[in-house]
Curated annotation (Swiss-Prot):
Protein name: Glutamate receptor ionotropic, kainate 1
Residue positions, PTM Phosphoserine: 725
Organism classification: Eukaryota, Metazoa, Chordata, Craniata, Vertebrata
General remark: The postsynaptic actions of Glu are mediated by a variety of receptors that are named according to their selective agonists. This receptor binds domoate > kainate > L-glutamate = quisqualate > CNQX = DNQX > AMPA > dihydrokainate > NMDA.
Binding-site residues, L-glutamate: 531, 533, 538, 704-705, 753
Keywords: Cell membrane, Disulfide bond, Glycoprotein, Ion channel, Ion transport, Ligand-gated ion channel, Membrane, Phosphoprotein, Postsynaptic cell membrane, Receptor, Signal, Synapse, Transmembrane, Transmembrane helix, Transport
Subcellular localization: Cell membrane; Postsynaptic cell membrane
Modification Phosphothreonine, positions: 761
Function description: Ionotropic glutamate receptor that functions as a cation-permeable ligand-gated ion channel, gated by L-glutamate and the glutamatergic agonist kainic acid. L-glutamate acts as an excitatory neurotransmitter at many synapses in the central nervous system. Binding of the excitatory neurotransmitter L-glutamate induces a conformation change, leading to the opening of the cation channel, and thereby converts the chemical signal to an electrical impulse. The receptor then desensitizes rapidly and enters a transient inactive state, characterized by the presence of bound agonist.
GO cellular component: intracellular membrane-bounded organelle; kainate selective glutamate receptor complex; plasma membrane; postsynaptic density membrane; presynaptic membrane
Domain of life: Eukaryota
Reactions it catalyzes: Ca(2+)(in) = Ca(2+)(out)
Cysteine pairs bridged by disulfides in the record: 765-819
Similarity annotation: Belongs to the glutamate-gated ion channel (TC 1.A.10.1) family. GRIK1 subfamily.
Amino acid sequence: MEHGTLLAQPGLWTRDTSWALLYFLCYILPQTAPQVLRIGGIFETVENEPVNVEELAFKFAVTSINRNRTLMPNTTLTYDIQRINLFDSFEASRRACDQLALGVAALFGPSHSSSVSAVQSICNALEVPHIQTRWKHPSVDNKDLFYINLYPDYAAISRAILDLVLYYNWKTVTVVYEDSTGLIRLQELIKAPSRYNIKIKIRQLPSGNKDAKPLLKEMKKGKEFYVIFDCSHETAAEILKQILFMGMMTEYYHYFFTTLDLFALDLELYRYSGVNMTGFRLLNIDNPHVSSIIEKWSMERLQAPPRPETGLLDGMMTTEAALMYDAVYMVAIASHRASQLTVSSLQCHRHKPWRLGPRFMNLIKEARWDGLTGHITFNKTNGLRKDFDLDIISLKEEGTEKAAGEVSKHLYKVWKKIGIWNSNSGLNMTDSNKDKSSNITDSLANRTLIVTTILEEPYVMYRKSDKPLYGNDRFEGYCLDLLKELSNILGFIYDVKLVPDGKYGAQNDKGEWNGMVKELIDHRADLAVAPLTITYVREKVIDFSKPFMTLGISILYRKPNGTNPGVFSFLNPLSPDIWMYVLLACLGVSCVLFVIARFTPYEWYNPHPCNPDSDVVENNFTLLNSFWFGVGALMQQGSELMPKALSTRIVGGIWWFFTLIIISSYTANLAAFLTVERMESPIDSADDLAKQTKIEYGAVRDGSTMTFFKKSKISTYEKMWAFMSSRQQTALVRNSDEGIQRVLTTDYALLMESTSIEYVTQRNCNLTQIGGLIDSKGYGVGTPIGSPYRDKITIAILQLQEEGKLHMMKEKWWRGNGCPEEDNKEASALGVENIGGIFIVLAAGLVLSVFVAIGEFIYKSRKNNDIEQAFCFFYGLQCKQTHPTNSTSGTTLSTDLECGKLIREERGIRKQSSVHTV
């Protein structure tokens, strides 16, 4: 009203009033009136999607900025949107020129690399900022300065993937790419084999055809368990369906997807398969502000008309939408810092750049902001994003984290953040393997596992029942009890299946495996619970738990028939060699004693003490007397010959000590040899087997025992394997039962595990274990290599061991009736068959003594008769020559008397010479 009165009064409009009004219109009004800043967007469309998600995010960001005046209080952001067909770079260039002519402060899009290059070239020529949010292959000679790209650098993502591969210690990796740009994005990983011990196999998805089943079939056949997929999220959704169809969605596979939209896919169908699925996430959903924006976006999308099926969760914000949202905000931040930003109309054909373009471009590159995709900063030189974080997420069954908003709750429920990769500091895993195993029942509870096993008493046997049995009830044994205990601890359900070929698992000359090991390698079974030996060659292709039983290889052989001691069994306590050595020792000691007794002067004595001047001395230790002394000492009897000299006493004392030990040892062993029936076995050890060929021996075909001898470098075992391999048709048996029957019925020795031998000998008294253990090893639960169940099974086995349940189970299944009849043979009365030889020796000695006495009598009689005749004849001749007679009666008498005297004198001389020996 006041302004109306003032104007109505004439004469009050003056020159000063005019200048004031002009000042207000030129200076005050522009500063207080809201400015308008126009930005342009070029977006590609497809037939079934007229409006893509980037355009929606572009509009969503502009609307959010205009509603919230805190960022641009005096500026209103407007936009101009142009839509082009996919891959149409010419149309993209034309639409870009149209927008530049209209006057825009920055230009967003398009997405495809060829269109991006065309628009970027125009923006660089006219010095207008070009904002990019998609990965673009950088040109080597690119000198464009007027662009920024919010998408993480391809080299950085490739390094992140390589760091993750090294962290998981993957030795073989399969890279599956969708198009040729995938090989460019994964350059750091592809070059890894030259620097790290990693084998990389590269495969390409079929182009145009979405059927990847043939490719997946090859991967399954090649046992390629660690796979990196470089593809879009649409392709990833389709690939996952086919992976499930091929039966490759199991806990043995680990899939990594390079798409940053993996978290946005609907993976509810795969959560409980046990598969390992890992990816990167750029959205910073841990930030409550980010979560609230995502919720708003989701609400708007759910209210919009339904979109074509893309595999994404309904209303989920993708990474490309978040990047576009952040890109608009980065331009808004830069424009807020710029004062008096005037946008000019530019013509492509004039090549006249925007005057404020370089300054505005620098403001954008210098801008910093914590957006939906984390902290955003740019490299001022190349315009690429730097110092960004990638969340490492892993698919899980159930979550415990809490988040605001339904979308965030779902993300936390399906995905678990296990680490962060920063472009500067690298990998930082926050969820270690130890944390994952804190509760050992987490991943096994209510999961059904396929268990492969083999019939082997007492580990796995058919249950005897009058009623038909089905499923796991068909079997019983130690391994079934072990499975039941493991199931009670870990909470899993199991389905027991016998191995089709009935073998444990061995490798042929071509490197192919069979038996239970092959079942695990081919992932037809999750566990192998059987008497499966932990060996080096098996450990290279499958994993083992800690052993639940320790054992070794030994020899199973039938008990030899008992032989009663013979009549000369009293000789058995000492070997024939010892008997010979004792006899030689007795003869040697006798000779030494004879020589020393002759040599020492203290063994000579005067036989006539009353005549000290006698020159006649005697020595008791003649050769026969020395031998008699030795025999008497050996038989522990006296010989009435006592050595007098110190030297001869030393010989006698040492001989007595020798005989003491020999007789004591003989006496100690005599009772056992005479009273116990001896079991004489032709073999006592593996060396005895190797030294002979009469007794055939072998092992179970394709078992760990056979593998042990096949791989052994010890000469004895190499010789044994040469014997077995030369007779494979007869030496090697199909299973233990066949081998046991051969041991019982033929001359055959079976090499097998000591625990099995212990079980068999408890129930068959005709069999026994020969020798000790050849080696030491253990039985373990087998799992496919890389199985997540191995550590959990190991912990459960250690728990059973500490509780003593493993020992109780073995006692239950190994305890048998025994062989008590063995005890009755330990003591028995001696009969003639035991010691009859002693009587034979006695009788032989008596008979021998009689014959020796007769021989001595005859020998002495003949010797005396010869001496008397010789002397009578000799002295008769002497008498006739000395005393010739004249008369027959006188001379003859004298001669006879002289002859008799001479004969008597000669006999006296001979007798004296026989007593006094010098």
